[in-house]
Amino acid sequence: MKSITVICFLALCTVAITSAYPQEPVLADEARPFANSLFDELPEETYQAAVENFRLKRATCDLLSGFGVGDSACAAHCIARGNRGGYCNSQKVCVCRN
């Protein structure tokens, strides 16, 4: 049983190392056609409204609550955004302080 576990662990490590191996760098000019988004297609007024109302979905509190680090991860996320910290509210949504 131990040998099967070791073999599976080594196979997992091999897959992780080979998938992390760097590929050829992609030039910005080559990547631009693939990076088109909805924001590129909008008129200027609609673009401004979309940027103002754009909200990233937060999964920090909900996913990490099982490990007991939900509030800490939320606070670290908010500090990285330039706020003073944050907390998870009762609905498992990260709320950043100003």
Swiss-Prot record:
One term under GO cellular component: extracellular space
Q: Which residues cross the membrane?
A: none
Q: Does the keyword Disulfide bond apply?
A: yes
Which residues belong to the propeptide?
A: 21-58
Matching Pfam families: Defensin_2
Query: Which BP terms in the Gene Ontology apply to this protein?
Result: defense response to Gram-positive bacterium; humoral immune response; innate immune response
Q: Which UniProt keywords apply?
A: Antibiotic, Antimicrobial, Defensin, Disulfide bond, Immunity, Innate immunity, Secreted, Signal
**Where does this chain mainly localize?**
secreted
The answer, when asked if Plastid is one of the entry's keywords, is no
Q: Give start-end of the signal peptide.
A: 1-20
* S-S bridge residues: 61-88, 74-94, 78-96
Regulation: induction: By bacterial infection.
The subcellular localization recorded is: Secreted
**Main role?**
Antibacterial peptide mostly active against Gram-positive bacteria.
Which family does this protein fall into? Belongs to the invertebrate defensin family. Type 1 subfamily.
Annotated protein name in UniProt? Defensin-B
Read off the lineage from the record: Eukaryota, Metazoa, Ecdysozoa, Arthropoda, Hexapoda
